């Protein structure tokens, strides 16, 4: 089976200078992949010519006349730039011409346009950004990592349901364990939203293990960690910064003198393994869960190596049938999610009415909602 992916070539800080080389490298190592490169045609073809890939049959150029800038407000991306590379790429997924879309574009815009074009799965009010972070024995899936900076308790329950379905589908675990990220393990800890979310999770059918703390993220304490997008994004960026700092310190220390340089040569195999394990670029690419189509969000600052990993995330998700399995799980749990929403106050509650991001369950926002224009 050919895996067809669309690439938003104009998204991110570097546009085609990063996305096109990444796409070219990817198809050279994945014979069953076909990538549609969406964006300003002249810019894409110039990169393909430079890389001697202009005639590669695994690459198709799809023209789009507009670009969603990293600092564009959501309203501009959704209402005005209807021929943007981001939207055209997502439309290909909606029309079943591609199986997933990969973009390094503005997070808020990508979330809004994806939700408008693809709609959400039954029972899901807000999609969430999810990714599997390494731990000593495998991976811990964490969500949300930046799509929703403010959440209601029922949204955190929905994130837990999606995380459960994702881990069950990809890792084959029958009952993945769930943890709620908090400032302490005790039930009394946290703000009101976290406490209410904990109550919903405890009464759900999920394998909820209670609150977890920041130091549990990389321990493998639970299979899935749930949090709002503000906390998740800060935790993710902090982790990446720490990994980079450790690499820089080791490089600096081994370069201090001729003796330490000799020691570095002797320790080279270990250092190379360490560098590979802490290189955050290979963990680039997070899925937007809860949509009726696969969307992978890359860091806006990603280089070609990192963006190639984001493409691989989309490729692997298609291969593993993640969307189909997630949709099936959400359909099975739709009743419990609806009950949780009523328990939390329902769509008519003051807290939800005050949140312009919420929109109807169908996934079609009545008005474009505001979100961060982050480079997450």
From Swiss-Prot:
Q: Name one GO biological process term.
A: fatty acid biosynthetic process
Q: Cite a single GO MF annotation.
A: phosphate:acyl-[acyl carrier protein] acyltransferase activity
Q: Does the keyword Transcription apply?
A: no
Q: In which pathway does it act?
A: Lipid metabolism; phospholipid metabolism
Q: Which InterPro entries match?
A: FA_synthesis (IPR003664), Phospholipid_synth_PlsX-like (IPR012281)
Q: Give the top-rank taxon of the lineage listed in the UniProt record for this protein.
A: Bacteria
Q: Which residues form a coiled coil?
A: none
- GO CC annotations? cytoplasm
Q: Which Gene3D superfamilies match?
A: Isopropylmalate Dehydrogenase
Q: What class of enzyme is it?
A: transferase
Instruction: Please classify the protein's predominant subcellular localization into one broad category.
Output: cytoplasm
Q: Which reaction does it catalyse?
A: a fatty acyl-[ACP] + phosphate = an acyl phosphate + holo-[ACP]
Q: Please state which protein family the record places this protein in.
A: Belongs to the PlsX family.
Q: What does this protein do?
A: Catalyzes the reversible formation of acyl-phosphate (acyl-PO(4)) from acyl-[acyl-carrier-protein] (acyl-ACP). This enzyme utilizes acyl-ACP as fatty acyl donor, but not acyl-CoA.
Q: Which HAMAP family match?
A: PlsX
Supply the name of the protein: Phosphate acyltransferase
Please tell me the species this chain comes from. Answer: Paraburkholderia phymatum (strain DSM 17167 / CIP 108236 / LMG 21445 / STM815) (Burkholderia phymatum)
**Organism phylogeny:** Bacteria, Pseudomonadati, Pseudomonadota, Betaproteobacteria, Burkholderiales
